[in-house]
């Protein structure tokens, strides 16, 4: 399994949905980064289940335990281990899934690859694995903010067909956190909540789009050819459970424009800094950040595990039906926001360290 991510700032996540716990080991974190357990807990609380009626009813406090790598509120430069223990496990809810495959879930492919799987809550394929990513992302955010003033903010842009008009240059964390669906447009947020409520009552699920902006990103992050910044961001974000699409800047809509319409023209601002008039490139050109805001979007499919009867097969290939039990999100989007933020922060933090190591080692 590919459980490790990153180059200089590396994370390895561990644990299963209904095992003893989940967590992360972070290697390559610089020393003397100021971070409190409360900073990590804040991000985990945004991700945790049971926080509202439109998320899974599983009740977990997701309390983080910092096992190593920190002392007196600062990082030591040694491996950081963060553990979150599972409390509200109900493996009996998944007993039927020991033999029967959930449509569009990882059950069948895990069996095909490994010949064995933890069917209790999906095991390693569960979104509970992302706890380690979000915890590591909290530290990456601190490094980015303290070293370069970078701010990473995600929000729900669309739920099924309900879409919000949001300015990524102006959106604030307070606006995002002002409602349970994490859409900074209050009117659209209410429409989204009503749609998720209706879907939940129908024992079904829906998907949507998370948009994320990284502001004040320094120029020069990323590298040709295979380590282009947008390629690294795409891999990171699409490694999240249920993520089925990724675009940056103008994305697929840019294919409808001509070069003259799409190109971001340059100018020099009043401080002498070279800027672009528009930002259809999404803050990245030639795989390298250009100093403009990085704007990306991630598409998340409807949750695979639903309560409606579906045709499927068991491990023997025999036809059957499954109406899944257990506790599941009718829509993953509200809880996916901190996950997307975390993966973006991890990539930017890793590339910030790599840029300093390669290009600024001998500069004054």
From Swiss-Prot:
Pathway annotation: Metabolic intermediate biosynthesis; chorismate biosynthesis; chorismate from D-erythrose 4-phosphate and phosphoenolpyruvate: step 7/7
Cofactors that this protein relies on: FMNH2
This protein's encoding gene: aroC
Name of the protein: Chorismate synthase
Binding annotation for NADP(+): 47, 53
HAMAP family: Chorismate_synth
Enzyme Commission code(s) on record: 4.2.3.5
Family, as annotated: Belongs to the chorismate synthase family.
Keyword Amino-acid biosynthesis: yes
Annotated FMN binding sites: 124-126, 286, 301-305, 327
GO molecular function term, any single one: chorismate synthase activity
Catalyzed reactions: 5-O-(1-carboxyvinyl)-3-phosphoshikimate = chorismate + phosphate
Function: This reaction introduces a second double bond into the aromatic ring system.
Enzymatic class: lyase
Organism per entry: Acaryochloris marina (strain MBIC 11017)
């Amino acid at each position: 399994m590919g459980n490790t991510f990153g180059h200089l700032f590396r994370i390895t996540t561990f644990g299963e949905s209904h095992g003893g716990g989940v967590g992360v080991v972070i290697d390559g974190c610089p020393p003397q980064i100021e971070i409190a357990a409360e900073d990590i807990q804040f991000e985990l609380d945004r991700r945790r289940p049971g926080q509202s009626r439109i998320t899974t009813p599983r009740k977990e406090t997701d309390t983080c335990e910092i096992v190593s790598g920190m002392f007196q509120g600062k990082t030591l430069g040694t491996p950081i281990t963060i553990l979150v223990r599972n409390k509200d496990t109900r493996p009996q809810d998944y007993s039927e899934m020991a033999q029967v495959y959930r449509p569009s879930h990882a059950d069948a492919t895990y069996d095909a690859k490994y010949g064995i799987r933890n069917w209790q809550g999906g095991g390693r394929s569960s979104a509970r694995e992302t706890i380690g990513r979000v915890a590591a992302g909290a530290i990456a955010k601190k490094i980015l903010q303290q070293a370069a003033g970078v701010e990473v903010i995600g929000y729900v842009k669309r739920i099924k067909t309900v879409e919000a008009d949001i300015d990524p240059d102006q959106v604030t964390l307070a606006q995002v956190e002002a409602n349970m669906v994490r859409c900074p447009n209050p009117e659209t947020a209410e429409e989204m909540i009503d749609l998720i409520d209706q879907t939940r009552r129908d024992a079904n699920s829906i998907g949507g789009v998370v948009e994320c902006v990284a502001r004040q990103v320094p120029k020069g992050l990323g590298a040709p050819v295979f380590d282009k910044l947008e390629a690294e961001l795409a891999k990171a974000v699409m490694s999240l459970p249920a993520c089925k699409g990724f675009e940056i800047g103008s994305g697929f809509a840019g294919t409808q424009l001509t070069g003259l319409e799409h190109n971001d023209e340059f100018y020099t601002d009043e401080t002498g800094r070279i800027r672009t008039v528009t930002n259809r490139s999404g803050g990245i050109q030639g795989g390298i950040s250009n100093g403009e805001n990085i704007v990306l979007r991630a598409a998340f499919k409807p949750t695979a595990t639903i309560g409606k009867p579906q045709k499927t097969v068991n491990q023997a290939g025999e036809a059957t039906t499954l109406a899944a039990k257990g506790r599941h999100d009718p829509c993953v989007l509200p809880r996916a926001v901190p996950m997307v933020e975390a993966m973006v922060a991890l990539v930017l933090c890793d590339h910030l360290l790599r840029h300093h190591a390669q290009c600024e080692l001998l500069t004054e």
